[in-house]
Amino acid sequence: MAIGPIQLLKQATPAQRRTLLAAALGWMLDAFDAMLYALVLAYVMRDLGMSKKTAGFLYTLTLLASGIGGVFFGFLADRIGRKRALMFSILTYSVCSFASGLSTTVLMLAVFRFILGLGMGGEWNTGATLVAETWPDELRAKAIAVVQSSWAIGYALAALVAGVVLRYANWRFVFFVGILPALVTLWIRKGVPESEMWVDHRRTRQDQELEPRVARGTQGNESFFTIFRAPYGKSTVALLLLNFFGLFGWWGLFSWIPPYLSLPVERGGRGFGIMGTATLLIVLNLFGMFPGYLSFGWVADHLGRRKSFVLYLFAAAVFVPLYAMARSQAAVLVLGAVVAFFGTGFFSGSGLIGSEIYPTRLRARALGFTYNGARALSCVAPWIIGWVGQGKGLSWAFYLCGGAFFLASMMATQLPETKGKRLE
């Protein structure tokens, strides 16, 4: 029998609900801080004298840093625990969002956005790992889908805040609001339990370290390259490439949609203005991204993980070119919501299938590498789309994003089916 989000929460224990809320808040506020840059980009470009290529390059730096941060925080989460690593990542991106508002030069802004990216990358794998290890097998897909859906809420909240703040103040104050997520760490520290699976694994590892060296197991001391060896090697490469092409398509498209909608027509945009753009983005998130993220967990429990990936990614590849050709506000609204549904919904599967492929001793670092490593590789997407858009227009550049989603759907066919698998 299918269950909805409310029934899902009723079936969970209080500790499971708190871990879900912590991961969802972290991911929502990650989106909030990350997307503030896109929402004020047109104003930052004007005041700091940035070209589209330079603006895209700053996005590239942030995504590159997120890959580094994902790997770093993955190792950190395996060493000091999921909860503390989650707290550190949230503090990192919150403080640097505030600092971005103090920037007076492009170089200053680049430094702060780079450090913000480190925290942004670390939050995803630590939160996903915490939920995967806390929730039971039969509810795991739906729980992670709920976490992923919070990105859409964060993006919509960022659009709302930017739309309101920019009416009364400049873009710097939009970044200043980005410090607020730091307050969430106070609650996480007191109210969220550590993953019992990680605690048990650490206790086992400590017991092994008390035994003679000849009898000592290798858990906890395995090389990073274990994820490239049998039986994980093929899955690691396939998941890395799926995430790379998917993230290339997503960041290439959604990092440029806000300026694309708000810039005047003569500058290659749609000329909807800041309030029109904010309204379109809120609708896009609440009626496209949010149900897309949320639905994937339920679809994956019916079709399986692999088929669901192929469905969502292939649909995104079809609808992105149609969105790029849209001219009227109504067409932009409807097609934008459809693209957001499929083009972001598949992300709910990345943490899910990765958690089911890898054992506890490798899980956080493997998720950190396959997702945030891919995010680092895809860091060129905003720069490439900005560069192509400067010469040929952003509409034409968006076709590249559709091609990236298609390649991601092909990579999904190489993944193992993990539906119903118990975590090791």
Model features per residue range: what roles?
Residues 1-32:
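Cytosolic juxtamembrane N-terminal segment immediately preceding the first transmembrane helix
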Residues 44-45, 76-77, 161-167, 261-262, ...:
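Interfacial helix-cap and linker-helix signal at transmembrane-aqueous boundaries
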Residues 38, 231-291:
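Extracytoplasmic gate region of multi-pass secondary transporters
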Residues 283, 288-291, 298-353:
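C-terminal transmembrane helical hairpin of 12-TM major facilitator-type secondary transporters
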Residues 68-106, 303:
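Conserved MFS/SLC helix-loop-helix module at the cytosolic interface between two early adjacent transmembrane helices
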Residues 112-149:
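Cytoplasmic helix-loop-helix junction between adjacent transmembrane helices
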Residues 49, 81, 102-108, 136, ...:
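Helix-breaking motifs and short loop linkers at transmembrane-helix boundaries and internal kinks
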Residues 147-190:
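Helix-loop-helix hairpin linking two adjacent transmembrane segments in secondary transporters
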